[in-house]
Amino acid sequence: MAEQKINTTESGSTASILSIRGLQKSFDSLSVLKDISLSVDRGNVISIIGPSGSGKSTLLRCATFLEHADGGDILYDGQYALKDGVYASKAELNRFRTRFGLVFQNFNLFPHYSVMRNISEAPILHGENREEVRERAMMLLKKMGLEGKENAYPCQLSGGQQQRVAIARALAINPEILFFDEPTRALDPELTGVVLKVIRQLAEDKMTMVVVTHEMPFARAVSNRVIFMDGGVIVEQGHPEEVFGNPTQERTRQFLRNYQQ
């Protein structure tokens, strides 16, 4: 991967914590992201919807450097992480990684770590005071409705509890933006409601979030903007009432009709 120092000057909107411009990604001959552009303003919730294979998760993985894009720009707070397909240095990318938290559909907790260690490991490794981190972790567990679970191990928790631990872990580094990749897909309906309630509370607290989801009523209720993707492109985006209530594109209407049936 080519690297160079590309943040000699600031660029982009100060209101946008994340800006993506002309992002492209292919796997071999398959183009999965085609000229994707979007921005995420502070305090906003962006929901990304669309059929399986539309590029939603790949977009999140590129935005968080889990996949390397082939072209385009990625900026955090106006600073380039990717410029014209060239990435910033490893040191700069590591600095950008402290700005965001990630929550996946399969929890990704360390099975041999206690709940407390799962939550506190990253900030301690970043040099934060151990006692301060523990205090923050206890506050997060209370916020997640998991008081008394700090010494439990993932295998002793339900799927919904594990996902709430994963959210607490993502919040423990005090991120500026949270990314969720289908956080309820592996959960049964009852546990789904508990996790969505937590994310809804984060939205009310003005946590900046990008959420890939198949939970349409949730996306409509909590989002500032909804993005519909299909075939590696953004087909339509706008206010949730516009996208869900009066979509302008036939493909969007077809997707929503099929989903409701």
Where in the sequence are the language-model features?
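Catalytic Walker B motif of ABC-type/P-loop ATPase nucleotide-binding domains
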Residues: 178-181
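Conserved signature/switch motifs of ABC ATPase nucleotide-binding domains
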Residues: 152-155, 173, 205
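Short coil-to-helix segment of the ABC ATPase nucleotide-binding domain corresponding to the Q-loop/switch region
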Residues: 113-121
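Conserved ABC transporter NBD signature motif
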Residues: 72-84
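ABC ATPase "signature
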Residues: 237-238
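Helix-to-loop junction immediately C-terminal to a conserved catalytic motif
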Residues: 64
